[in-house]
Amino acid sequence: MILYHGSNVIVEQPKLIRQNRYLDFGFGFYTTTNRDQAVNFAQKVTDRRKIGAATVNIYSVEEAVAFKECSLLRFDSPDEAWLDFVADNRQGTYQGKQHDLIYGAVANDDVYRTITLYMTGVLDKEQTLAALKIRKLFNQLVFATEKSLQYLHFEGRELV
């Protein structure tokens, strides 16, 4: 499987760095199979930080091996379990089992607005899930432990 990570720097050896904000799937190194999504993120992060150059880092992972050797939490669609997991992580309240790898839909800006309406009580769970079904969602694979990072191999980078 080929994976991409958008950044403002080259990331040959990914590290787990604590963020100062809460993300969809919690703490970890975020990747995607969607190159366009990585390009978009690289441009956003470079604009926000005003340093570096928009860079798409390219990785490979033998998913059959990694998914067997690591604990994997997989969301195949943005369902109720995914919504609860993302909402808990975004609020910093997730207390469940920790996993090595987490795969599922990305809560991008549009999706995040919908989730925020849910977290603030404007939308209920049913309304939120219905709204998410009409959105085009991309994926993310998060490497959440040092163990999981062992399966991620840097293949190169592309300035975008």
Regions found by a protein language model. Name each.
Residues 23-24, 40, 44-160:
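Conserved NAD+-utilizing ADP-ribose enzyme module
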